[in-house]
């Protein structure tokens, strides 16, 4: 039985389509994510004391919380940034058939 707190969204950004596609392929092939949505974004941030803005790709990664550390490790190993954005957002609740599909589509650690 799953609970609504078993799932999370991982957010990451990358600078180009090639790195985006590497990360997506790596996560999906390892069954560390059930679904990854992408969209172009404009990021504004401070880096090494300078105000910067860049066009990036946002990755919205749907997975299970128990897989987060593996997801983080996979992204870190494939990512081109010196400091990659990799953050976890818990899914508090969701449509049960979707959450069940998410569970069935990802790596089982049991």
Segment roles from a protein language model:
Residues 1-110:
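Positively charged, small/polar-rich N-terminal and surface patches that mediate targeting and assembly
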């Amino acid at each position: 039985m799953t609970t609504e707190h078993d799932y999370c969204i991982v957010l990451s950004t990358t600078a180009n389509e090639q790195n985006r596609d590497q990360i997506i392929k790596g996560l999906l092939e390892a069954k560390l994510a059930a679904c990854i949505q992408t969209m172009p974004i404009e990021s504004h941030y401070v880096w090494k004391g300078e105000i910067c803005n860049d066009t990036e790709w946002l990755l919205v990664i749907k997975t299970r919380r128990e897989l987060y550390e593996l997801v983080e490790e996979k992204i870190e190993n494939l990512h081109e940034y010196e400091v990659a954005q990799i953050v976890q957002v818990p899914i508090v609740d969701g449509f049960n058939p979707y959450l069940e599909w998410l569970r069935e589509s990802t790596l089982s650690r049991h």
